[in-house]
Amino acid sequence: MARTKQTARKSTGGKAPRKQLATKAARKSAPSTGGVKKPHRYRPGTVALREIRRYQKSTELLIRKLPFQRLVREIAQDFKTDLRFQSAAIGALQEAAEAYLVGLFEDTNLCAIHAKRVTIMPKDIQLARRIRGERA
């Protein structure tokens, strides 16, 4: 389609000026009630998609190191007391644990999508583990 020149047209009157006056009056009265600006909110799902892209790009560990280390030591206490861990061993355990969880959540998401849902539920995790053969 060919581009056409835009020309300004004169208004033929009507109800537009009255509407404008009403909005101006409303605007003047609004700040006097407190002037609190409504905080900006993104639409549902926008932030989630941004976080997905951010975490898929990154390679850093997502679980904090010290809480994970305490958990490992607490679990190890049940098997043998006075166990010592090299920091590299804790790091390797954390890397493996996070890789496992990411894979499990990917499979869980596929189970939810298969059920025509976008929200993952405990039953999706159970199904993913059962299909993997981790739990009968």
Swiss-Prot record:
Phosphorylated at Ser-11. This is required for transcriptional activation through TBP recruitment to the promoters. Phosphorylation at Ser-11 also promotes subsequent acetylation at Lys-15. Mono-, di- and trimethylation of Lys-5 by the COMPASS complex activates gene expression by regulating transcription elongation and plays a role in telomere length maintenance. Lys-5 methylation enrichment correlates with transcription levels, and occurs in a 5' to 3' gradient with tri-methyl enrichment at the 5'-end of genes, shifting to di-methyl and then mono-methyl. The COMPASS mediated di and trimethylation of Lys-5 requires histone H2B monoubiquitination. Methylation of Lys-37 by SET2 represses gene expression. Gene3D superfamilies: Histone, subunit A. The modification Phosphoserine is found at S11. The modification N6-methyllysine is found at K5, K10, K19, K24, K28, K37, K80. The modification N6,N6-dimethyllysine is found at K5, K15, K28, K37, K80. The modification N6,N6,N6-trimethyllysine is found at K5, K28, K37, K80. It is found in: Nucleus; Chromosome. Keywords: Acetylation, Chromosome, DNA-binding, Methylation, Nucleosome core, Nucleus, Phosphoprotein, Ubl conjugation. Pfam families: Histone. InterPro entries: Histone-fold, Histone_H2A/H2B/H3, Histone_H3/CENP-A. GO terms for cellular component: nucleosome; nucleus. PANTHER family: HISTONE H3. Belongs to the histone H3 family. The nucleosome is a histone octamer containing two molecules each of H2A, H2B, H3 and H4 assembled in one H3-H4 heterotetramer and two H2A-H2B heterodimers. The octamer wraps approximately 147 bp of DNA. Core component of nucleosome. Nucleosomes wrap and compact DNA into chromatin, limiting DNA accessibility to the cellular machineries which require DNA as a template. Histones thereby play a central role in transcription regulation, DNA repair, DNA replication and chromosomal stability. DNA accessibility is regulated via a complex set of post-translational modifications of histones, also called histone code, and nucleosome remodeling. This is Histone H3.3.
